[in-house]
Swiss-Prot record:
UniProt name for this protein: Deoxyribodipyrimidine photo-lyase
Reaction(s) catalysed (UniProt annotation): cyclobutadipyrimidine (in DNA) = 2 pyrimidine residues (in DNA)
Organism of this sequence: Potorous tridactylus
Cofactor(s) essential for the protein: FAD
Biased composition (Basic residues): 24-34
Superkingdom of the organism of origin: Eukaryota
GO MF term set: deoxyribodipyrimidine photo-lyase activity; DNA binding
Keywords: Chromophore, DNA damage, DNA repair, DNA-binding, FAD, Flavoprotein, Lyase
Positions bound to DNA: 322
Amino acid sequence: MDSKKRSHSTGGEAENMESQESKAKRKPLQKHQFSKSNVVQKEEKDKTEGEEKGAEGLQEVVRQSRLRTAPSVLEFRFNKQRVRLISQDCHLQDQSQAFVYWMSRDQRVQDNWAFLYAQRLALKQKLPLHVCFCLAPCFLGATIRHYDFMLRGLEEVAEECEKLCIPFHLLLGLPKDVLPAFVQTHGIGGIVTDFSPLLHHTQWVKDVQDALPRQVPFVQVDAHNIVPCWVASDKQEYGARTIRHKIHDRLPHFLTEFPPVICHPYTSNVQAEPVDWNGCRAGLQVDRSVKEVSWAKPGTASGLTMLQSFIAERLPYFGSDRNNPNKDALSNLSPWFHFGQVSVQRAILEVQKHRSRYPDSVTNFVEEAVVRRELADNFCFYNKNYDKLEGAYDWAQTTLRLHAKDKRPHLYSLEQLESGKTHDPLWNAAQMQTVKEGKMHGFLRMYWAKKILEWTRSPEEALEFAIYLNDRFQLDGWDPNGYVGCMWSICGIHDQGWAEREIFGKIRYMNYAGCKRKFDVAEFERKISPAD
């Protein structure tokens, strides 16, 4: 799809790119630290101006950085290792009328490698580019909290696409039911989509592939991870210690600035129909009892505002206070990362500028936002039982089953857990924070899930309840990080065996007394009062 002539193979340029990169000399990278050559260095003046002007200043600095990188993606050396072929055919047909970027996980225009690759193909072939998003009226157990955040972000995407002369199409229905028909009706010559390791998304991709005409090339670009999932490792990694060096070794090749998505010069006769956003919300078949939250405003612009506030106000304390739920030291970027409204790569590019001032904070943020996040994608990509006890290591399955019949000190129903009606005021406060705010402090997520193991009838039920509650209330639900968080807490994924005890077996144990040694538990309990 990226050939100079439409009759040529779409894989040729990718093969050339890989060949050149395999011969390139890699510069050594110190552990937990980026070399100066791995990013386009920003002038100190830009950094200062961005800090002084706040979020608007950051957005302008970012825009200028893209323009300095390349006039467009056509003049940018695109790393084809980000791309993998889904279809069998890789030749573009002569009668092709346009390209499509099927947006799914990465719901933003700029800083989006999948969008950029789609525009690159369209510019090379001098064809129009369309963006399609497939909106199902219901999705698993998603609530209006999730849909509202997503739709308001997509509304911003649609507005930006219009300014760039790229039609945005909101297709109502499952991808297999609406996207192939759009392709056939409008003579689409090729499709680019983004990447998710989760089963529902991989099934959508397969269903679309099966329904597409065989002659339509279909490729996938990992626009979510800095190091593409299939490049970072070709197998399920045991833990952070085994994947960390693989990611850091590859960062010099992948942690680059982005070129801009530009105003597309080739217009289409197929215009996008105006989207009735209010009508879309009204037609959703979702639970509306889990309300929207006020602290997180959807969209890329608001996400960059949150990034700027993190850098200016909380990054200095992230290294020392990130595990204290009473301290405001976290990035709070998880919802924007989950919906792809802000690129993790963009966040790292901006945060790492401050390494000299806050080395510990930057190192720890990179560990969490890059290594741990990409480890979660790795687990879900290579382990299809990522949300089941069967996905755990053999030692963990064995120890949990040996202790499955151990007497529980308390047993709670799903309804009691959901409403925060347990004997544990810290657990109740953590649950109510999730219900009210759509988020839970990272340290408490571990304690919260481990107590569910202790208070339910079996490890299978504990995992089921934890995932249900996480996905129902967290703004970043249905995410690899959420599944891995529950699997780490309950099933020991990416962990080791510990001293054996009742119920937990060899799974790492946490308790109320341990939390009291970490932070002022009473202060947190006072801040988050249980529901009436």
